[in-house]
Amino acid sequence: MKILILGIFLFLCSTPAWAKEKHYYIGIIETTWDYASDHGEKKLISVDTEHSNIYLQNGPDRIGRLYKKALYLQYTDETFRTTIEKPVWLGFLGPIIKAETGDKVYVHLKNLASRPYTFHSHGITYYKEHEGAIYPDNTTDFQRADDKVYPGEQYTYMLLATEEQSPGEGDGNCVTRIYHSHIDAPKDIASGLIGPLIICKKDSLDKEKEKHIDREFVVMFSVVDENFSWYLEDNIKTYCSEPEKVDKDNEDFQESNRMYSVNGYTFGSLPGLSMCAEDRVKWYLFGMGNEVDVHAAFFHGQALTNKNYRIDTINLFPATLFDAYMVAQNPGEWMLSCQNLNHLKAGLQAFFQVQECNKSSSKDNIRGKHVRHYYIAAEEIIWNYAPSGIDIFTKENLTAPGSDSAVFFEQGTTRIGGSYKKLVYREYTDASFTNRKERGPEEEHLGILGPVIWAEVGDTIRVTFHNKGAYPLSIEPIGVRFNKNNEGTYYSPNYNPQSRSVPPSASHVAPTETFTYEWTVPKEVGPTNADPVCLAKMYYSAVEPTKDIFTGLIGPMKICKKGSLHANGRQKDVDKEFYLFPTVFDENESLLLEDNIRMFTTAPDQVDKEDEDFQESNKMHSMNGFMYGNQPGLTMCKGDSVVWYLFSAGNEADVHGIYFSGNTYLWRGERRDTANLFPQTSLTLHMWPDTEGTFNVECLTTDHYTGGMKQKYTVNQCRRQSEDSTFYLGERTYYIAAVEVEWDYSPQREWEKELHHLQEQNVSNAFLDKGEFYIGSKYKKVVYRQYTDSTFRVPVERKAEEEHLGILGPQLHADVGDKVKIIFKNMATRPYSIHAHGVQTESSTVTPTLPGETLTYVWKIPERSGAGTEDSACIPWAYYSTVDQVKDLYSGLIGPLIVCRRPYLKVFNPRRKLEFALLFLVFDENESWYLDDNIKTYSDHPEKVNKDDEEFIESNKMHAINGRMFGNLQGLTMHVGDEVNWYLMGMGNEIDLHTVHFHGHSFQYKHRGVYSSDVFDIFPGTYQTLEMFPRTPGIWLLHCHVTDHIHAGMETTYTVLQNEDTKSG
């Protein structure tokens, strides 16, 4: 404790005089909140009243649109009598708190509610007594006073906008941060206690407004889960007409309390988002919530920039912090929607008005300069997801009993099989729509996708669209400019179903009708200087986006810099271009589902469309509509310059990690081999394949991988090339074994028990408590462990700085130009292997090592395995076993490989550099090879276990950091003044979206510039370096910010000690 107080004293002494002091008087009040205060008049036409009533209509056992909530309000002074009015568009968010680097901010908090709450801020410096978060951190007395502000009490939090937590060099002048209550953070936030904190660079504000910005807006995208609110019981009693009938565990009841909202307003009811055409607008965005909170915020009709990159869709997850700049264009009322298709249906949209205020425009009118004309029809086809009938990976028939693929391809009484009637976009030669354009070999990989629409900056695109289908359809483009008369999305902000008003033709092209769209490509929508030459974009039908897209109506678009394309549309200096659309095509949502049941099942009248197994059989995990390696045309030559355009659409299941085995690519200055994609994301990746062979392009999300979202790409030796000129200077040899062990996810339960005691909660633990027949916290697992030599007798003891690795294999190191030799002994009872991301190998096949055998694996580390020029000096890759990469991973086989740039020599760095590798993974023990062993060994009543029981399955999903839960990961210790590299790794399934939050400090990361945050998003296949310079002593929380993951124990602490050099004897 003495050390801690001394540290704070020294920190204060070394801090420069604070530029200015700011005082905010914030009260926590309880009030009634209306999620749709304009009675739901504004909405997408395709959202029927019945759908909105699920969430907005109260009844005997439904709460409806009104909820009791706790909110932060701002007051004028310490009397807490007079509130300061906030902009209406803030909704239920707390007031905006702003600070510039060098400011000292005092938040005077008064709790006017009926239960204890706090104020915890992100991305700003505070000492332990101003953290506002309760967890076991060894603090006592005065340092605990901030942890709970009881009803009627006050507490003053002091926050310091220090240099270490200011926006990074590459960030905008002001960045998004947040504050919220943190006793049980998910419950406090669900109850309403969340608000925006905006941190700015020094001298970037003028009278509290960012200079050179005309309007600013803060928006939170969140599925606010009222089931987690502290006031659920009150809301049931107050708003349900027969509260005694309510079953809180009923799924439909729970869904009715999930409010898909922007700032607490749902179904387009958010007021006040208004601006002038040509206004310079700054958007501060963040997400909040749970696994369902996979958001794609889309600004219809506008183009934005973030970190100097052109964007139009922003992916937000729980606690993702984002800001974007926009010059408002196109007068009219536009939608700001979440393009997660499930969210779109459930009311997650708002409207913003762009008014004509006669501001002078610097934009030239580019219409008519160079017109590219496309003739595109929507037509019906029968589409086969795997024309060969074979799983190209296993060489088995797709309907082989017990195979992963049989679920999707079996045809029978109530199963459709692998062929579906679909609607697709196809290109014709002219407006007569008689001659279809044939696709050449370069295009055969496109599969189900529509034709590539391409244009350069300065072009006008004209698309004559003919609807040969039986439903009204449209074309909505992403990434070009159009006016309201050319918008393909079907909505009317003030639509009244009784008026029977006719929707505009562009957004509702009736069957047999034709419409010509006109879009332009001004400089403001094209690639920026930082962007690649061409941006991947997309177009789709948006009359009912969910149904239209899943029916098959989507295609790729690329928008390129002026003068960068050949006459045939291919990019200059590029040999091959490929378009990949990974998605889970949900055929249950298709417009043609009834037709498919009639055509392909043998007993259509017996089909139950609500049956879960029937629904699962229609979820086609595909790339361009192909599954299990059936995609043709992915061939290239060694040494080619290859551009991959990736894009996706869908819902929260569409969390993709697209892994290119055998090669790496460059993206935003970073070297990677796995690209993360989400609904309506698009990416442009540049690859120079350097090894011949056949490799996989696959989704690492485990359900997608087993479900068939994997293909093969081939690199041929097409021309004589000089041998690999890399001179491999160093050779490193590691002796690694696969060893079976007993692993305890939570060897100590004290931290967890103290946490619940501090929160005044008495909760059982579904994951760690054994109960009558659950497994508990101990499982048999297999892990990678290092040995001293080839005898494999003496294991290498882990040093103190390696204690944090937990279940992970040893942290392997290599420099660019090294050759890494892994002597691998399989000391386990079944075949395993060892394979690393990012490296170069002689063969594309990874040979399994049988039990008892030893094999040698060689990994070369050429330039393309190391960091990009604008990346951190050292980058992480994962290594794991690929015999069955899903079961092997969940059984425990994974570790980090750290690759550094050759000139990066630690000798020249006088400061102490620490390295911590962290794997955030929900270990699904149901998928482990050892599940049966674990039931036999650890369940008290193995004979009572039903492996298909939902609660049993859930109890085996261990939400862990390096295989430890609830504060059990030890060894994350550093000193003030250290330089720390955090190597974050993500693997796993659809639920493995992790927003990693560090209390007490921010970190820096690089994407062609240096950026700062205290939350980083990771997904299956994310490997990222974060750099931290700890300054504030204390024990600090480190956790995933996703609601269920917090409650399930994905939390630990890291310790910052005072620097020994500054201690006085």
Swiss-Prot record:
<feature type="binding site">
    <location>
        <position position="1041"/>
    </location>
    <ligand>
        <name>O2</name>
    </ligand>
</feature>
<dbReference type="Pfam" id="PF00394">
    <property type="entry name" value="Cu-oxidase"/>
</dbReference>
<dbReference type="GO" id="GO:0005886">
    <property type="term" value="C:plasma membrane"/>
</dbReference>
<feature type="binding site" description="type 1 copper site">
    <location>
        <position position="1040"/>
    </location>
    <ligand>
        <name>Cu(2+) 6</name>
    </ligand>
</feature>
<feature type="binding site" description="type 3 copper site">
    <location>
        <position position="1041"/>
    </location>
    <ligand>
        <name>Cu(2+) 2</name>
    </ligand>
</feature>
<feature type="binding site">
    <location>
        <position position="955"/>
    </location>
    <ligand>
        <name>Na(+) 3</name>
    </ligand>
</feature>
<feature type="binding site" description="type 1 copper site">
    <location>
        <position position="343"/>
    </location>
    <ligand>
        <name>Cu(2+) 4</name>
    </ligand>
</feature>
<dbReference type="GO" id="GO:0006879">
    <property type="term" value="P:intracellular iron ion homeostasis"/>
</dbReference>
<dbReference type="InterPro" id="IPR008972">
    <property type="entry name" value="Cupredoxin"/>
</dbReference>
<dbReference type="InterPro" id="IPR033138">
    <property type="entry name" value="Cu_oxidase_CS"/>
</dbReference>
<feature type="binding site">
    <location>
        <position position="779"/>
    </location>
    <ligand>
        <name>Na(+) 3</name>
    </ligand>
</feature>
<keyword id="KW-0479">Metal-binding</keyword>
<feature type="binding site" description="type 1 copper site">
    <location>
        <position position="1050"/>
    </location>
    <ligand>
        <name>Cu(2+) 6</name>
    </ligand>
</feature>
<feature type="binding site">
    <location>
        <position position="64"/>
    </location>
    <ligand>
        <name>Na(+) 1</name>
    </ligand>
</feature>
<feature type="binding site" description="type 1 copper site">
    <location>
        <position position="994"/>
    </location>
    <ligand>
        <name>Cu(2+) 6</name>
    </ligand>
</feature>
<feature type="domain" description="Plastocyanin-like 1">
    <location>
        <begin position="20"/>
        <end position="200"/>
    </location>
</feature>
<dbReference type="InterPro" id="IPR045087">
    <property type="entry name" value="Cu-oxidase_fam"/>
</dbReference>
<keyword id="KW-0560">Oxidoreductase</keyword>
<protein>
    <recommendedName>
        <fullName>Ceruloplasmin</fullName>
        <ecNumber>1.16.3.4</ecNumber>
        <ecNumber>1.16.3.1</ecNumber>
        <ecNumber>1.11.1.9</ecNumber>
        <ecNumber>1.11.1.27</ecNumber>
    </recommendedName>
</protein>
<feature type="binding site">
    <location>
        <position position="417"/>
    </location>
    <ligand>
        <name>Na(+) 2</name>
    </ligand>
</feature>
<feature type="binding site" description="type 1 copper site">
    <location>
        <position position="709"/>
    </location>
    <ligand>
        <name>Cu(2+) 5</name>
    </ligand>
</feature>
<feature type="binding site">
    <location>
        <position position="408"/>
    </location>
    <ligand>
        <name>Na(+) 2</name>
    </ligand>
</feature>
<feature type="disulfide bond">
    <location>
        <begin position="276"/>
        <end position="357"/>
    </location>
</feature>
<dbReference type="InterPro" id="IPR011707">
    <property type="entry name" value="Cu-oxidase-like_N"/>
</dbReference>
<keyword id="KW-0964">Secreted</keyword>
<dbReference type="GO" id="GO:0005788">
    <property type="term" value="C:endoplasmic reticulum lumen"/>
</dbReference>
<feature type="binding site">
    <location>
        <position position="146"/>
    </location>
    <ligand>
        <name>Ca(2+)</name>
    </ligand>
</feature>
<feature type="glycosylation site" description="N-linked (GlcNAc...) (complex) asparagine">
    <location>
        <position position="397"/>
    </location>
</feature>
<feature type="disulfide bond">
    <location>
        <begin position="874"/>
        <end position="900"/>
    </location>
</feature>
<dbReference type="InterPro" id="IPR048236">
    <property type="entry name" value="Ceruloplasmin-like_CuRO_5"/>
</dbReference>
<feature type="disulfide bond">
    <location>
        <begin position="637"/>
        <end position="718"/>
    </location>
</feature>
<feature type="glycosylation site" description="N-linked (GlcNAc...) (complex) asparagine">
    <location>
        <position position="762"/>
    </location>
</feature>
<feature type="binding site">
    <location>
        <position position="120"/>
    </location>
    <ligand>
        <name>O2</name>
    </ligand>
</feature>
<dbReference type="GO" id="GO:0070062">
    <property type="term" value="C:extracellular exosome"/>
</dbReference>
<feature type="binding site" description="type 3 copper site">
    <location>
        <position position="180"/>
    </location>
    <ligand>
        <name>Cu(2+) 2</name>
    </ligand>
</feature>
<feature type="binding site" description="type 1 copper site">
    <location>
        <position position="338"/>
    </location>
    <ligand>
        <name>Cu(2+) 4</name>
    </ligand>
</feature>
<feature type="binding site">
    <location>
        <position position="67"/>
    </location>
    <ligand>
        <name>Na(+) 1</name>
    </ligand>
</feature>
<feature type="binding site" description="type 2 copper site">
    <location>
        <position position="997"/>
    </location>
    <ligand>
        <name>Cu(2+) 1</name>
    </ligand>
</feature>
<feature type="binding site" description="type 1 copper site">
    <location>
        <position position="656"/>
    </location>
    <ligand>
        <name>Cu(2+) 5</name>
    </ligand>
</feature>
<feature type="domain" description="Plastocyanin-like 5">
    <location>
        <begin position="730"/>
        <end position="900"/>
    </location>
</feature>
<feature type="glycosylation site" description="N-linked (GlcNAc...) (complex) asparagine">
    <location>
        <position position="138"/>
    </location>
</feature>
<keyword id="KW-0325">Glycoprotein</keyword>
